[in-house]
């Protein structure tokens, strides 16, 4: 399948934003809360946009197994030794059996968090969420009411997410992410199925990027103001147009960048799973090192101009592993074998 350059740009920028947002920064800074709240919708929209019907449940599940299930298992297993070291450094002793099993149980429960378990590799929550969305779409396709069912589920997810923001009944992390992001996934799916959003026009795309990003920022500022004013319903309702405008603002911006074909961006896009699965380890190591070198008591808090080069450094450290994975171990980037990149050029 021929790669879509503007989608590679979107995935690469989104995954670098994920790394940036996992570097501790003050919640008082608007840009940080904005990116924290909105970045993940890019992945869900693109996942829906690229969703294909492979003709049979067997072929669909083969794709899900290699692209979502196995990477979820691998990257959870890979970070468990890191979790043990982190526990030892923070408590001064190795965990007992109960605490040692806690993150493993959390991973089995899709990065669940409660008094008995905790997420082992929290950033991976979106993989089971996307898997569930794919399965829902596949099931709905077998009926003649697929779009009515999906629209109904999106409406239900909105009300569940709204209720959960008030009563906090849904477990973290995957169920909340599923309720929150299903509408954006379905929107992407519709755009992909009906071949929408494919034309490239530099001037129109630049105007679209500026307009949608401006509206997104305004909606998000209003969304935060509603929260501080205890306007619960308005706070939730405004979150959706902020996200939708963000999606189109970012994607129009990536269409502007479509004229620039960068092999590094392509490889980062292909290696999204590597970065999502392993960056949290590097974030912790860098935070720990800087805190001790600078004798910082408590948790370090970066400014944006400090966090940005660190995020780029983390991606750069993982980049050789991405290249190796593409060439030698495709399962780490969610691929079955070598044939998928025969027509790709690696740099």
Model regions: which residues?
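Alpha-helical transmembrane segments and their immediate juxtamembrane cytosolic regions
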Residues: 1-347
């Amino acid at each position: 399948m021929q790669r879509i350059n503007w989608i590679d740009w979107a995935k690469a920028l989104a995954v670098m934003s994920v790394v940036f947002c996992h570097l501790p920064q003050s919640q008082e800074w608007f840009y940080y809360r904005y990116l924290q709240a909105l970045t993940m919708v890019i992945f869900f929209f693109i996942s829906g946009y690229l969703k294909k019907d492979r003709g049979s449940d067997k072929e669909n599940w083969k794709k899900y197994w290699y692209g979502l299930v196995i990477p979820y298992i691998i990257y959870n297993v890979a970070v468990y030794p890191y979790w043990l070291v982190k526990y030892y450094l923070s408590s001064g002793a190795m965990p007992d059996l109960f605490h040692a099993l806690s993150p493993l149980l959390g991973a089995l429960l899709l990065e669940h968090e409660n008094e008995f378990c905790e997420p082992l590799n929290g950033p991976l929550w979106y993989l089971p969420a996307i898997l569930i969305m794919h399965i829902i779409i596949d099931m709905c396709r077998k009926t003649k009411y697929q779009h009515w069912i999906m629209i109904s589920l999106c409406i239900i997810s909105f009300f569940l997410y709204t209720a959960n923001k008030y009563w906090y009944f849904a477990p973290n992390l995957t169920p909340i992410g599923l309720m929150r992001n299903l509408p954006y996934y379905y929107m992407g799916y519709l755009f992909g199925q009906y071949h929408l959003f494919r034309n490239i026009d530099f001037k129109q795309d630049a105007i679209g990027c500026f307009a949608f990003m401006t509206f997104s920022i305004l909606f998000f500022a209003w969304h935060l103001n509603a929260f501080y004013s205890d306007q619960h319903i308005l706070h939730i309702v405004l979150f959706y147009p902020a996200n939708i405008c963000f999606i189109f603002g970012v994607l129009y911006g990536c269409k502007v960048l479509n004229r620039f074909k960068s092999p590094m961006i392509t490889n980062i896009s292909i290696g999204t799973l590597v970065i999502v699965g392993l960056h949290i380890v590097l974030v912790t190591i860098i935070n720990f090192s800087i805190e001790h070198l600078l004798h910082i008591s408590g948790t370090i808090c970066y400014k944006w101009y400090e966090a940005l080069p660190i995020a780029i450094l983390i991606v750069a450290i993982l980049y050789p592993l991405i290249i190796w994975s593409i060439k030698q171990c495709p399962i780490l980037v969610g691929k079955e074998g070598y044939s998928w990149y025969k027509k790709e050029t690696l740099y």
